[in-house]
Amino acid sequence: VLTNNWDEIVNDPEIDIVIELIGGIEPARSYILAAINAGKHVVTANKDLVASEGKKILATAKRNGKDFLYEASVAGGIPIIRPLRQSLVASELTEVMGIVNGTTNYILTRMTEDGMGYEEALALATKLGYAESDPTADVEGYDAGRKVAIMASIAFNSNVTFSQVYTEGITHITAEAVSYTHLRAHETKANL
């Protein structure tokens, strides 16, 4: 169905699955809840929404017997949501670690391995298409923070929202700091 009228989608009994590609919190949240309440499964990669409203949406989906699938919201190319949900049920997790933002990882790697300054590494990441035209969410830690909120909520069976996750960007990291850290045999990385 190609339409710009949301009601046509929600009220069409032929539509079983809705894929949300809007991004942000609103109107995506309202549309997703309306779709679930209308008996439709929903798929999204919207980490902003999942990190802030995921538990509420999951509860609505469960009440309605529908799926709310958001695997692509965290490490899109790596299946992490399903293993956290299903494979680790008998395990007691005490921490989750990993590199969850490719842009910051690339920038820090260039600074560490090539001695680049932050601005130079960011410019190269942008030129190569690794960084968004507005890299704020990546370089200020918001993207990683949202992913941490989603994974922590699942891993620790809790309701962790983005606002509860401490984030610190990499914009203040200097080439000198990276060099000093590297000399001390530690790698600077964007870790959880």
What does each of the following model-derived ranges do?
Residues 36-52:
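ADP-ribose/adenylate-binding Rossmann-like module
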Residues 47-68:
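Rossmann-fold NAD(P)-binding glycine/threonine-rich loop
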Residues 36, 62, 126:
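Anion (oxyanion) recognition and catalysis
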Residues 181-188:
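Conserved small/polar residues in nucleotide/adenosyl-binding loops
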Residues 1-37:
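N-terminal glycine-/serine-/threonine-rich beta1-alpha1-beta2 phosphate-ribose binding loop
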Residues 20-22, 45, 52, 71:
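Structural motif
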Residues 54, 67-180:
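Core active-site phosphate/anionic-ligand binding loop and the adjoining beta-turn-alpha structural block
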